[in-house]
């Protein structure tokens, strides 16, 4: 049996938070300078607001649908579940359906919320909804190189080997495996 440890924790809350305005804005994000004043110091944050994001993990006959996309920081192809920004006045599940169709040519339906989370709690706003379903049909003729159906076992192997690097995809696969 484990003994519960007593922690002497000091948590610093800022006395004042000042938003200094938008330092950058484009179609996909805005960056705001924020100054947090504590008792003995100040801390400057540059908070990037990407807006909310929706994703869908499709599992049909034990295989997961992954899109294949070039990613600059990898300078390579990344295997990812279909995901993207939620447009203004768009519901998260509708955004996930749209993104899946845009990225893979598959139309999915009967989505259920698997998990929602915030990937960063300090410098990035990007509330994320991950849905799951077993219902999808191909309605757009896409190049087969744009997507892949991969078994859950092989997805887990790809994560362990560093072949799947996208955090949203890793969270989605592990959540599907362990929470559902």
Positions of predicted regions on the chain:
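Short, solvent-exposed loop/turn elements at beta->coil junctions and helix N-caps
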Residues: 22, 115-120
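Active-site-adjacent beta-strand/loop module that shapes the phosphate/pyrophosphate-binding cleft
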Residues: 30-40, 120-139, 148
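Nudix hydrolase/Nudix homology domain
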Residues: 1-12, 77, 88, 122, ...
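Conserved Nudix-box catalytic region and its N-terminal flanking loop in Nudix hydrolases
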Residues: 50, 54-98, 138-142
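Conserved beta-strand segments that form the floor/walls of ligand-binding pockets within enzyme
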Residues: 65, 80, 112, 130-132
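A short coil-to-beta-strand element that immediately follows conserved catalytic motifs
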Residues: 107-115
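Acidic, metal-coordinating catalytic segment for phosphate/diphosphate chemistry
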Residues: 18-55, 60
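Short loop segments at secondary-structure junctions
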Residues: 39, 60-63, 70, 133-138, ...
